[in-house]
Amino acid sequence: MAQREWVEKDFYKELGVSSDASPEEIKRAYRKLARDLHPDANPDNPAAGERFKAVSEAHNVLSDPAKRKEYDETRRLFAGGGFGGRRFDTGGFGGFNVGGDGAEFNLNDLFDAAGRSGGTNIGDLFGGLFGRASGGRPSRPRRGNDLETETQLDFVEAAKGVAMPLRLTSPAPCTNCHGSGARPGTSPKVCPTCNGSGVISRNQGAFGFSEPCTDCRGSGSIIEHPCDECKGTGVTTRTRTINVRIPPGVEDGQRIRLPGQGEAGLRGAPSGDLYVTVHVRPHKVFGRDGDDLTVTVPVSFTELALGSTISVPTLDGKVGVRVPKGTADGRILRVRGRGVPKRSGGHGDLLVTVKVAVPPNLDGAAQEALEAYAAAERASGFDPRAGWAGNR
């Protein structure tokens, strides 16, 4: 759901992109800013840390299609300070406060604006804006934002899987109050004004409305003695190291979701998720084709013509691969079950491409042998270009 603060924030400006920017443009802008503003790169610059958090929040909203749609609709509804040119006080939805022209707010303006914005559900929109569900149901603590990070793996690590530490600087549960927001030895109390629901009811003429409780700010609880470390939020920004298990067979560019490892929610609310984008370094010998492992092996002409068994590397050591007599240069030989581990179990195959290596120099014996072979080849009538389209 949208947040009340969205009305006053320009996430597009925060990332330096236009409001019609593509997802790829948003991702590129975020990566550049996050790299420049990351706390690890600016240890003595608190302003960079605050900007980093603002950029992360903007990316969290604009990178999620559902959140971006709701954000755009929210901004359209409140464009110009209100509906139909009248100012609307977002701090008092139940009161229908209007601006300096003294004009009376008409409910029809609200629903007309909703229709123009593409069918926005007013209950859902305002329920999200004011931190509660539509219909006046008790509010729930807001889940923390999702986080994104990147890591690089060697080819073999990506193929076989690996456990690795990942260092993050992000909002995390306060270690002093364990995320409750209350000073150690105390605990939050149920708000007596709203009885823990987070909303209070008001009447406006013939209509009844619910709005966030002003005493607990919609949380349903009151902290009389806030934690000294987090000032009652339950969250502090710190650097932490988590152990990540990268599953076997991960591919370059793939995203891995780690539930509950994202930004901490306020006052003990659930944490968001962490998405890790994996980048795989190329290997000097191996390649990949899905779950199949590919390798090109140099061979001699005689090994192809006469047949042989060659030694081929795999992820688990070398194996012998039989080259049938008369194998053509560039042929692919398949070795089943020697490829990359599959998510569904088992392994892909090893695809071996044989490539003739021509000797740059020949000694006398080799020269004579090849000349004798060439003469025998001509005598047999063999023409390597017979049937070739270039001869037509």
Swiss-Prot record:
In this chain the J domain maps to: 10-75
Q: Where in the cell is it found?
A: Cytoplasm
- Domain of life here? Bacteria
Keyword flag Metal-binding: yes
Positions contributing to Zn(2+) 2 binding: C191, C194, C213, C216
The family classification in the record reads: Belongs to the DnaJ family.
Q: What is known of its domains?
A: The J domain is necessary and sufficient to stimulate DnaK ATPase activity. Zinc center 1 plays an important role in the autonomous, DnaK-independent chaperone activity of DnaJ. Zinc center 2 is essential for interaction with DnaK and for DnaJ activity.
Recorded hits in NCBIfam families, A to Z, give: DnaJ_bact, PRK10767.1, PRK14279.1
Question: PANTHER family from the entry?
Answer: CHAPERONE PROTEIN DNAJ 1, DNAJ HOMOLOG 1, MITOCHONDRIAL-RELATED
Record protein name field = Chaperone protein DnaJ 2
Q: Which organism is it from?
A: Mycolicibacterium paratuberculosis (strain ATCC BAA-968 / K-10)
Task: List the top taxonomic levels of the source.
Answer: Bacteria, Bacillati, Actinomycetota, Actinomycetes, Mycobacteriales
Q: What gene, per UniProt, encodes this protein?
A: dnaJ2
